[in-house]
Curated annotation (Swiss-Prot):
Annotated protein name in UniProt: Major viral transcription factor ICP4 homolog
Assigned keywords, A-Z: Activator, DNA-binding, Early protein, Host cytoplasm, Host nucleus, Phosphoprotein, Transcription, Transcription regulation, Virion, Virion tegument
Annotated phenotype, changing V1197A: In strain: Oka varicella vaccine Biken (V-Oka-Biken), Oka varicella vaccine VarilRix (V-Oka-GSK) and Oka varicella vaccine Varivax (V-Oka-Merck)
Other comments on record: Encoded both by ORF62 and ORF71 within the inverted repeat sequences bounding the Us region of the VZV genome.
GO cellular component terms, A-Z: host cell cytoplasm; host cell nucleus; viral tegument
Upper lineage: Viruses, Duplodnaviria, Heunggongvirae, Peploviricota, Herviviricetes
A Gene Ontology molecular function term of the record: DNA binding
Location of region: Disordered: 117-271, 285-454, 636-696, 1195-1258, 1282-1310
């Protein structure tokens, strides 16, 4: 037996009409319809509702919709289901509804009438109330023509027999009737409450026009394919204003009819409506006592059980909203509806609604089915709930408080909506998690509270309700986290690239630029990232924004890009905003709040909403906010930190009353110290606290006062009786190495920053850096180590940050307060600059540079040489490689020996050190202290220090060294794009600027070197010049055919001594040719490669570039390579400067103060420019042409083209140039032969040369990389060489093989 529906009492809300008024409305409508059925005959042709072709004739047209009265065609709705609303969300959301017609919750009246009969046994009418359907499409029926004689009074319904069903074979209406009736409109009636049998108005105000109209059968068939045959749909709406579009998507309520006996008469609609609304259901065959047979029009009495909660229906575009009340249970379908489609049983009986006004019932997506969905409210046989229960949405605390006070609640007249309360249209929509066809993950929302809620400061970080975070469950063994919370992908631990990356990850102490979950141990990467964020000499914002994936990391990144699930876009959720940061699900699973710091810093770095300064402000704020979690000992979270900072323990009072026996108290304290002096054991680790500078320590940690009393108690004679005495336990075992500046000033030999007085070349350090101080005793213990040369130890006392780093690397000891350093190798590499020049007073020039990550003047580490990919090339930022290349007068490209990525050992700068040049990096130990110490030391000797700053202004370290204007300071940042091939990689080679470099006084190069050399000549006139831009200043250690660690350039004598003996007596000519480079290009990647080139200049000897002045502003030469004048491009294309370790740089001179780009004509340029240098080969050295090969395989052939070979007597008669004029490959009288040939060739002129029909020029042959390296292109065959041991060669044989009494040059056969 079905249980009666559950009764719920709901208070009257704004916008809901009174129940009595709704009953009166329905009774009056039924009485009016039945009254007209008796008066008017059924043969009236203008009956729109109950006539022969009326709306309610057939079972397909037994759906009456009040919006169709106005003749408006409702548009289809895309409907949506949302969260269940609370009682306070009942106010309608349309502004037009505030002054329009009231909403008639007709279904609530059904439920009220039905609930009154809950105590009795349910009857057929009760069981017929099966469901309430929302979103049913309106079906427009054909309208009969209107009688002209009844224009002013509307239509009259016939007797109830008009509701008898019509056979499907006889459809109602036809196309012609539809067209004829579509133009007809009925004139509505304007009535007031209780004085007319028409549709009454609930409120005493003007109502909008309503009319009755039919629907088209096609629309009905398309929109009601799933609806049952016997049912009544009622709807309340309003007619739009003049000029506005009709309202759409109103509520439609389908009320199933009571069961009838097969073959019996079908009751009319009014009778069926009466059966639903009446208190009792008539027996089978009995005549119903209809209310319109009496004249009683008084409102019916009913109990005060209230109306069930109403749920607003969603409507798109701010359309009127109706309200629906649901019956308590559902019943079996009507047995007579045999041809009606069977609906699927719903998964849940609970009714849900949507609170958004931007969509309607049904699917919220436009591409979903437009067919409305039916929501069941009960089970078919039992009243138990099926499916998942949905918790009601939380309501606002203010609204719930106002609902509690019934006496103070505002009494709103029914039919009107409140406009004094908050606008309910401004409300977010939460979609149902279990909605059919929409699988969404369970979400959570924070409670609405005005009181701030602070999460627990200890333990794992959980959700606000204490539950674990979504997706924190253990993963399967073959899956890793990827994408949104809870999603995973398949792991690839067995891939070779992943294995190699994991080996590098385990061996590295720095954060890897690309982290994938297969690497494992995310805590290691998080610790390294936190170390990077708090590192003072690193820029975490720049590194997180662009970690510069190169080599194996780039290949690994491309490998994982191919493994992305299909359909994912680039903006898909991946769980990490930057490649170095692990998936945030690892932090969520462990509940580690500190691991959110790298994610926050990476999000700031990747954001485009902030500039550089704003990003660093946010980064500094994050550092301060997470400092207590990252470094609890340094920020005072541990007792040891409170002791070292001088803060008393919160549990132990800092002051006590005077003890009458201080000696006894002192003895007690010596045996048992107080609680606030207890210390936690220090962790033995090399963590970020070790690498942070003093500045970070001071900013985050207020250190304790350095003046610690030696006595255990204060002397009784020095204190007042009224003051308590502070009892201390004497000095602690491990005091902080760096403290704040004493109030009485620092000691002369203490450790602090010596900022010179007066004007400075560099920015002034901050107050925190200047207040740092280290006692002389601590300095003596820290610097007493063989790692630090004695002459340079005072420089450490100028930098308290360096002292703090040394102290952090030394674990605490027993008798000795500072034990041996833990990172000996790291400290040795960072203080290697102290061994460049033994005596600080021998320093003449200080060159400051900012190395790229991975660049080190000590060379790569031996342990990581095989696995470390090396530094990343940057075309805009110059590091150590660009600085050394400029000092050695050569190009620096990723394929040359000058690039640090090709080094196998440390570069040799001893030639510069011998002339007093000191190279100092911004990452070196005591960088700031060294600059300030040298400035103070030389100033005290009445000497001026020369400083050449190659660091860009934006890369200058925070709180860097302060340099007085007494010294000479030149700022010239190192710029790789000063090389034309780097500035214009696509067109520089074709324009002939492959070896051109632009020189400027504000760029690290020959122009800025000239300023330093001029100042040096004025300050030290008796000393040898600096000679900064020379080929012999720097030597590199690279891998060549002579060995994996070859010092280049290798002199010709060393080449013959170490390379040739390996092929002495070799009969395999192919092996000999490959080993000696016979027939290969003379120069590969700007360095000597072939046998004849190595035997003449040395293996790895570099070609010299041509420098073009471009003024003070970098980039003034023009935005394109074609902007360089033609004559300058011709000169650079044909100029080939042979290697010379002592040659000066070739800088094209300006004319009358103008740069090379401003020559007026070719004659002016020809007169100002030097002769075009060339490489000339003596007879017997093979072909006269010189071949250059680039890293991409492109070959340049320099020599005569288009004619026969030069006569032998011409070659023999040409004298070889000496070292003084090697840059002039031609004599002055040869200018007309050489330069004119090149000039005419560029302009399409003559081709006069040394040989008939030939001209000197350059031919470019493009081949694949690595192809034809052992075969000459268009030249004579390779030379057969008979090798002899040259260990006893004389010094005169270093330059030439023949012509000076030595061995004769190798001759070619055939």
């Amino acid at each position: 037996m079905d249980t009666p529906p559950m009764q719920r009492s709901t208070p009257q809300r704004a916008g809901s009409p009174d129940t009595l008024e709704l009953m009166d409305l329905l009774d009056a409508a039924a009485a009016a319809a039945e009254h007209r059925a008796r008066v008017v005959t059924s043969s009236q042709p203008d009956d729109l509702l109950f006539g022969e072709n009326g709306v309610m004739v057939g079972r397909e047209h037994e759906i009456v919709s009040i919006p169709s009265v106005s003749g408006l065609q409702p548009e289809p709705r895309t409907e949506d289901v949302g969260e269940e609303l609370t009682q306070d969300d009942y106010v309608c959301e349309d502004g037009q509804d505030l002054m329009g017609s009231p909403v008639i919750p007709l279904a609530e009246v059904f439920h009220t009438r039905f609930s009154e009969a809950g105590a009795r046994e349910p009857t057929g009418a009760d069981r017929s109330l099966e469901t309430v359907s929302l979103g049913t499409k309106l079906a427009r029926s054909p309208k009969p023509p209107m009688n002209d004689g009844e224009t002013g009074r509307g239509t009259t319904p016939p007797f109830p027999q008009a509701f008898s069903p019509v056979s499907p074979a006889s459809p109602v209406g036809d196309a012609a009737g539809n067209d004829q009736r579509e133009d007809q409109r009925s004139i509505p009636r304007q009535t007031t409450r209780g004085n007319s049998p028409g549709l009454p108005s609930v409120v005493h105000r003007d109502r909008q026009t309503q009319s009755i109209s039919g629907k088209k059968p096609g629309d009905e068939q398309a929109g009601h394919a799933h609806a049952s045959g016997d049912g009544v749909v009622l709807q309340k709406t309003q007619r739009p204003a003049q000029g506005k579009s009709p309202k759409k998507k109103t509520l439609k309520v389908k009320v199933p009819l009571p069961a009838r006996k097969p073959g019996g008469p079908v009751p009319g609609p009014v009778e069926q409506l009466y059966h639903v609304l009446s208190d009792s259901v008539p027996a089978k065959g009995a005549k119903a006592d209809l209310p319109f047979e009496t004249d009683d029009t008084r409102p019916r009495k009913h109990d005060a059980r209230g109306i069930t909660p109403r749920v607003p229906g969603r409507s798109s575009g701010g359309k009127p909203r109706a309200f629906l009340a649901l019956p308590g249970r559902s019943h079996a379908p009507d047995p007579i509806e045999d041809d009606s489609p069977v609906e699927k049983k719903p998964k849940s009986r609970e009714f849900v609604s949507s609170s958004s006004s931007s969509s309607s019932w049904g699917s919220s997506s436009e591409d979903e089915d437009d067919e409305p969905r039916r929501v069941s409210v009960g089970s078919e046989t039992t009243g138990s709930r099926s499916g998942r229960e949905h918790a009601p949405s939380p309501s606002n605390s203010d609204d719930s408080d106002s609902n509690d006070g019934g006496s103070t609640k505002q009494n709103i007249q029914p039919g009107y909506r409140s406009i004094s309360g908050p606008d309910p249209r401004i409300r977010k929509t939460k979609r149902l998690a279990g909605e059919p066809g929409r699988q969404r993950q369970k979400s959570f929302s924070l409670p609405r509270s005005r009181t701030p809620i602070i999460p627990p400061v200890s333990g794992p970080l959980m959700m606000p309700d204490g539950s674990p975070w979504p997706g924190s469950a253990p993963l399967p063994s073959n899956r890793v986290r990827f994408g949104p919370s809870g999603e995973t992908r398949e792991g690839h631990w067995e891939d070779e690239a992943v294995r190699a990356a994991r080996a590098r990850y385990e061996a590295s102490t720095e954060p890897v630029p690309l982290y994938v979950p297969e690497l494992g141990d995310p805590a290691r990467q998080y610790r390294a990232l936190i170390n990077l964020i708090y590192c003072p000499d690193r820029d975490p914002i720049a590194w997180l924004q662009n970690p510069k994936l190169t080599g194996v990391n780039s290949a690994l990144n491309q490998f994982y890009q191919k493994l992305l699930p299909p359909g994912r876009a680039g903006t898909a959720v991946t769980g990490s905003v930057a490649s170095p940061v692990p998936h945030v699900g690892e932090a969520m699973a462990t509940g580690e709040a500190l691991w959110a710091l790298p994610h926050a810093a990476a999000a700031v770095a990747m954001s485009r909403r902030y500039d550089r300064a704003q990003k660093h402000f946010i980064l500094q704020s994050l550092r301060r906010a997470f400092a207590s979690m990252a470094y609890p000992e340094a920020t005072g979270s541990s007792p040891a930190a409170r002791i070292s900072r001088g803060h008393p323990s919160p549990t132990t009072p800092a002051t006590q009353t005077p003890d009458p026996q201080p000696s006894a108290a002192a003895r007690s304290l010596s045996v048992c110290p107080p609680d606030d002096r207890l210390r936690t054991p220090r962790k033995r680790k090399s963590q970020p606290v070790e690498s942070r500078s003093l500045l970070d320590k001071i900013r985050e940690t207020p250190v304790a006062d350095a003046r610690v009393a030696d006595d255990h108690v204060v002397s009784k004679a020095k204190r007042r009786v009224s003051e308590p005495v502070t009892i201390t336990s004497g000095p602690v075992v491990d005091p902080p190495a760096v403290i704040t500046m004493p109030l009485d000033g620092p000691a002369p030999n203490g450790g602090f920053r010596r900022i010179p007085r007066g004007a400075l070349h560099t920015p002034v350090p901050s107050d925190q850096a200047r207040k740092a101080y280290c006692t002389p005793e601590t300095i003596a213990r820290l610097v007493d180590d063989p790692l630090f040369p004695t002459a340079w130890r005072p420089a450490l006392s100028f930098d308290p940050g360096a002292l703090a780093e040394i102290a952090a690397r030394r674990p605490g000891g027993g008798d000795r307060r500072f034990g041996p350093p833990s990172g000996v190798e790291a400290l040795r590499r960072r203080c290697a600059w102290m061994r460049q020049i033994p005596d600080p007073e021998d320093v003449r020039l200080l060159i400051i540079y900012d190395p790229l990550p991975g660049e080190d003047i000590n060379g790569p580490l031996e342990s990581t040489l095989a696995t470390d990919p090396g530094p990343s090339w940057s075309p805009s930022r110059g590091g150590l490689s660009v600085v050394l290349a400029a000092l050695s007068n050569r190009l620096c490209l990723p394929s040359t020996h000058a690039w640090a990525g090709n080094w196998t050992g440390p570069p040799d700068v001893s030639a510069l050190n011998a002339r007093g040049v000191l190279l100092l990096s911004t990452r070196d130990l005591a960088f700031a202290g060294a600059v300030e110490y040298l400035g103070s030391r030389l100033a005290s000797a009445r000497r001026r220090l020369l400083v050449l700053d190659a660091v860009a202004l934006e890369r200058w370290p925070r709180d860097g060294p302060a340099l007085s204007q007494y010294h000479v300071y030149v700022r010239a940042p190192a710029r790789p794009d000063a090389q034309a091939v780097v500035r214009w990689p696509d067109s520089a080679v074709t324009e002939g600027l492959a070896r051109a470099v632009f020189a400027s006084s504000r760029t690290f190069g020959p122009a800025s070197f000239a300023r330093i050399e001029t100042a040096f000549a004025n300050l030290y006139p008796g000393e040898q010049p600096l000679c900064l831009c020379r080929g012999g200043n720097v030597a590199y250690t690279v891998c060549t055919r002579a060995g994996p660690k070859t010092r280049v350039p290798l002199s010709p004598r060393e080449y013959r001594q170490y390379v040739l003996p390996g092929f002495d007596g070799c009969k395999d000519l192919a092996r000999q040719s490959r080993g000696l480079g016979l027939g290969a290009a003379d120069f590969v990647d700007e360095a000597a490669h072939s046998h004849r080139a190595a035997n003449r200049w040395g293996l790895g000897a570099a070609l010299r570039p041509v420098f073009l002045p471009e003024g003070r502003r970098p980039g003034a030469a023009g935005p394109e390579a074609g902007d360089v004048p033609t004559w300058a491009r011709v000169f650079c294309r044909h100029a080939l400067l042979e290697p010379d370790p002592a040659a000066e740089p070739l800088v094209l001179p300006p004319v009358a103060g103008r740069s090379v780009a401003l020559y007026a004509s070719a004659d002016e340029a020809r007169n100002a420019l030097p002769p075009i240098p060339r490489v000339m080969w003596p007879p017997g050295f093979g072909a006269a042409e010189t071949v250059l090969e680039g890293s991409d395989g492109t070959r340049f052939v320099f020599g005569h083209h288009g004619g026969s070979e030069r006569p032998a007597e011409t070659q023999a008669g040409r004298q070889r140039r000496t070292a003084d004029d090697r840059e002039h490959a031609l004599e002055p009288d040869d200018w007309e032969v050489g330069c004119e040939d090149a000039w005419d060739s560029e302009e399409g002129g003559g081709d006069d040369g040394d040989a008939p029909g030939s001209s000197f020029g350059v031919s470019i042959v493009s081949v694949a990389p690595g192809v034809l390296r052992d075969r000459r292109v268009g030249l004579r065959p390779a030379v057969k060489v008979e090798l002899l041991s040259s260990s006893s060669s004389s010094e005169d044989e270093d330059d030439v093989w023949g012509g000076r009494g030595g061995r004769s040059p190798p001759q070619s056969r055939g």
